[in-house]
A protein has these predicted regions:
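S-adenosylmethionine
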Residues: 1-145
Length: 145
């Protein structure tokens, strides 16, 4: 995974981090392993059913400095929480699936691309004020169209 390498390069002191769209938990466990001891990682998944899977996987990982949450980005906007690092692995329009799944081509539309673009902007806008001054925002998506 690439994001844990980024964390190891940039983060050398304990931090408070938010993995905003974390299910099923692979990124969060890799991130937590890469963070300095004393760091606290919030692993969040807005979709309830996916957050339950996330919670199970985080529990199996067994690191005590991880908190699983089930919030939408706008909920964090309302909070007073401030994070040193935020990872936003935002929803995408799915072009990367074309080579693996014939059905993905049939489901693709310009409207879906536009919807994803608006949702991505909304997510970043909602969590921006939760990033401490000088903090790190890691923006990730699998398709840029």
């Amino acid at each position: 995974m690439f994001v844990d390498l980024v964390i190891r390069q940039l983060v050398h002191e304990p931090v408070m981090m938010l993995d905003l769209c974390a299910a099923p938990g692979g990124k969060s466990t890799a991130l937590r392993a890469a963070l300095p001891e004393g760091s606290l990682l919030f692993s969040n998944e807005p979709m309830r059913t996916r957050s339950q899977i996330l919670a199970e996987n985080i529990q199996k990982f067994g690191h005590p400095d991880m908190i699983v949450t089930n919030n939408y980005p706008r909920d964090y906007k309302k909070s007073k929480l401030q994070f040193d690092v935020i990872l936003t692995d935002v929803p995408c329009s799915g072009e990367g699936m074309f080579r693996k799944d014939d059905g993905a081509i049939e489901e693709w539309s310009l409207q879906n691309v536009d919807n994803c673009w608006h949702l991505q902007r909304e997510i970043v806008s909602d969590i921006w004020n939760c990033l401490k001054p000088g903090g790190i925002l890691i923006y990730s998506t699998c398709t840029f169209n």
